[in-house]
Swiss-Prot record:
It is a multi-pass membrane protein. One of its GO terms (cellular component) is membrane. Keywords: Membrane, Transmembrane, Transmembrane helix. This is Putative uncharacterized protein YAR069C. The chain crosses the membrane at residues 5-25, 27-47, 77-97. It is found in: Membrane. Its main location: membrane.
Length: 97
């Protein structure tokens, strides 16, 4: 039976340009990751903490990745020193297809 469990990781970014996309200060991104492989990274929510308002628009952008890209490779891209990750929350979401 195929595993449809996805992991949503909420990352608090500081200054920086992860994935080479210009970001404002303290944006929150929700990344949907496959439990075994990364099929694509979807930026669903862009939350501006300083204004406490939901922002969709241009920041709701999909990033297509090759299926064989590992999670460790993605974490190498997200350098803690470069973009200053303030915190990370992992949630498990089960999708019934």
């Amino acid at each position: 039976m195929e595993d449809h469990t996805l992991v949503a990781i909420v990352v608090f970014f500081g200054n920086g340009e992860p994935f080479h996309v210009s970001l404002s200060v303290e944006m929150v991104f929700v990344l949907l990751l496959s439990s075994t492989r990364i099929h694509e990274v979807v930026v669903l929510i862009c939350y501006k903490l300083q204004h406490a308002t939901w922002s969709w628009g241009n920041m709701s952008k999909n990033f297509s990745l090759k299926p064989d890209i590992s999670l460790s490779f993605l974490l190498d891209i997200i350098s803690i020193n470069d973009i200053c990750i303030y915190g990370c929350i992992a949630l498990t979401v089960v999708f019934i297809l």
